[in-house]
Structures are given as structure tokens and as C-alpha cells.
A protein has these predicted regions:
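Sec-dependent bacterial lipoprotein signal peptides
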Residues: 1-15
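Ser/Thr/Pro/Gly-biased, low-complexity, turn-/loop-rich segments
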Residues: 2-3, 17-185
Length: 185
């Protein structure tokens, strides 16, 4: 009986030492319509009836999109719909178009980073709907030492970097940094 108590206490102590154990759960992912643009995203901007204002543009490191005739427009933190509105307003103010019709589509998202116990850690392209386990698969799969049931995800939310515990089915966002932990034994 005493041996069982001692073994139980040892198991509880060892389980409490697991990496990432004290992290809060990952907050829910924003929907596609709520997606916020950031540096590294590439957007296709279509200004109907204006070839010169149509094309693919990258959100630069300062969070802006450089457009012909308009110059640079702030994009970081905006949804694609908000950027459509901002460009439309800028076109009106510059007296370039009276009733601009602007459409925006994200063509390339910011990359994700997969670190730790995967076969090929590194930077990978994000695909909408990507889960933690899909990211591990893209990174060559889990190593034999990996904890496969959860991982740590570092994400920027409202300009603040947070780290949280994520399950295999947790959805990722562009720019996430995923760390797959090593099993203790």
C-alpha cells in the first residue's frame, strides 16, 4: 500500500515536469473574414476598370502596401474588406476615381515556423485551415522522441506575443511558431 502511494506521488511529480504543461489553451482562430493582414502577406488587388491599379502586392515590413499612383497604404491589422475600403477612399481623395470598385484576395499568407521534434524544422507556407498535426506532417513528421498529443504555439494577438498549449487538431494562423516538445522517457 505504501509502495503504491510513493509510486503515485512520483508519477504526479514527473507528469508535472512535462514541457508546456502549464501553458494556457490556445485561443480560437479568427475566421477567414476576420483575418488580419500583416508583413509578408501578398494580396491581389483588383480595381475594376483600372489595369494600372490591379495586381499582386506584398505587405512590406512596415505594414504597408505600395500602390501605383497612390503611394503606400497601411495594411497591417486590417481585414481584406477594410483594406478594400481604405484603398477606395484613398482613390476618391486623390481624385483618381469617382466610384472605385476594389476587390482584395490574400494569395500568399505569412509563413509558419515548425521547431523542435520534427524531422525537418523550419519555415513553411501556411494554408488556410492548417492544423498543428498538418504542420508537423509538412515538416517531415514527428521524430520518435516527440510528444505528439500537444505542442506550444507562439502567436501575435493584438500586437502582443502569446504562447499557448495546442492540441493536434488546433488550427494555426499565419505567422505562428509551433514548438513540438521531446518526451522525457
Amino acid at each position: 500500500m505504501r509502495l503504491i502511494r510513493v509510486l503515485t506521488a512520483v508519477l504526479v511529480l514527473v507528469a508535472g515536469c512535462a514541457p508546456g504543461h502549464g501553458l494556457p489553451p490556445l485561443p480560437p482562430v479568427a475566421t477567414t473574414t476576420g483575418y488580419r493582414l500583416g508583413p509578408g502577406d501578398v494580396v491581389r488587388i483588383i480595381t475594376f476598370g483600372e489595369e494600372s491599379l490591379t495586381g499582386e502586392f506584398r505587405v512590406n515590413d512596415s505594414g504597408r502596401v505600395a500602390l501605383p499612383l497612390l503611394g503606400s497604404v497601411r495594411a497591417t491589422g486590417l481585414t481584406p474588406a477594410q483594406l478594400e475600403s481604405a484603398i477606395g477612399t484613398a482613390l476618391k481623395r486623390a481624385n483618381l476615381l469617382r466610384n472605385p470598385a476594389v476587390s482584395i484576395e490574400v494569395t500568399t499568407y505569412r509563413p509558419i515556423f515548425v521547431l523542435g521534434e520534427v524531422n525537418k524544422p523550419g519555415e513553411y507556407s501556411y494554408q488556410p485551415g492548417m492544423t498543428l498535426v498538418a504542420a508537423a506532417a509538412v515538416a517531415g513528421g514527428f521524430t520518435y522522441r516527440a510528444i505528439q498529443s500537444y505542442a506550444s504555439v507562439m502567436r501575435t494577438v493584438n500586437g502582443e506575443s502569446i504562447e499557448a498549449k495546442a492540441s493536434r487538431q488546433s488550427f494555426l494562423q499565419p505567422g505562428d511558431v509551433v514548438t513540438i516538445y521531446e518526451r522525457r522517457f
